[in-house]
């Protein structure tokens, strides 16, 4: 995905393709009724179905990376940390004498560790050679060492000295170009999400969306394009919607569903 100019979320992909399916399958082999993880999220039973909600402690809410779990899977899962805060968790761990009680929170990708993910990726995929960094008028302002190292909205590593901060506004994979511009050029109001899944049946009222992990909820309307693709229209334009990230839809604290942000509509908006 990095070589396609997309910005994936490894935690979502891990939960979707690796962690939970195998975890639940193994639990069944051991005759266990449920599995439990330390994610900050809540499961709420409603009539005959199960809902996924944001954690009570919103500072650590991880429901975004769990959006692919449907009601059937939620029935087999417990999230015991969903109703308590991180300080409370630390205190419980300290009382039990656990050495990790006051371990610093990790912001790293677990299988990369403290290394720069760009170096990790460049050793594992055939990345493009150097290319141009240009503005919206195709004026050359610099060069880059591979599109895998850039994401929409990125400021770090972007050539400056032009009177104002510049950001990555578009990644042209075919021509190996990085486009940069002002923050205003990052504004997006409509985009598509694909490979969409829902926790349960969907209601279309009072919806909002997060366009990346722990971002603010933005009120939105959604419209079905086909069985797995939906158009998102934001009530208010937002900045830095990056193809490859996930758009996760909420109804207040209830997680409705989500899908991967595509580049199709984004490119039309930028132009």
Regions found by a protein language model. Give the residues of each.
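Nucleotide-activated chemistry modules centered on ATP-dependent adenylation/adenylyltransferase
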Residues: 1-255, 259-271
């Amino acid at each position: 995905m990095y070589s396609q100019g997309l910005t994936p979320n490894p935690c979502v992909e891990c939960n979707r393709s690796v962690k939970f399916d195998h975890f639940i399958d193994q639990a069944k082999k051991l005759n266990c009724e449920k599995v439990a993880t330390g994610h900050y999220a809540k499961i709420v039973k409603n009539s005959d179905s199960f809902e996924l909600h944001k954690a009570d402690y919103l500072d650590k809410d991880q429901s975004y990376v769990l959006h692919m779990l449907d009601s059937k899977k939620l029935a087999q899962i417990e999230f015991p940390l969903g109703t308590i805060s991180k300080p409370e968790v630390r205190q419980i761990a300290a009382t039990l004498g656990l050495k990790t009680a006051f371990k610093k929170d990790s912001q790293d990708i677990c299988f990369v560790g403290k290394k720069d993910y760009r170096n990790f990726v460049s050793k594992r995929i055939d990345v493009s050679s150097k290319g141009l960094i240009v503005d919206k008028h195709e004026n050359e302002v610099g060069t880059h060492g591979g599109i895998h190292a850039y994401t929409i909205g990125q400021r770090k590593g972007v050539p400056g000295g032009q009177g104002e901060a510049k950001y990555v506004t578009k990644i042209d994979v075919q021509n190996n170009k990085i486009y940069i511009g002002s923050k205003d050029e990052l504004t997006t109001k409509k985009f598509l999400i694909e490979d969409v899944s829902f926790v349960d049946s969907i209601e279309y009222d009072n919806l909002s969306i997060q366009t990346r992990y722990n971002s603010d909820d933005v009120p939105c309307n959604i419209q079905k394009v086909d069985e797995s693709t939906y158009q998102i229209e934001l009530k208010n334009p937002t900045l830095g919607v990056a193809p490859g990230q996930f758009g996760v839809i909420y109804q207040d604290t209830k997680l409705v569903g989500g899908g991967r942000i595509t580049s199709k509509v984004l490119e039309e908006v930028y132009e």
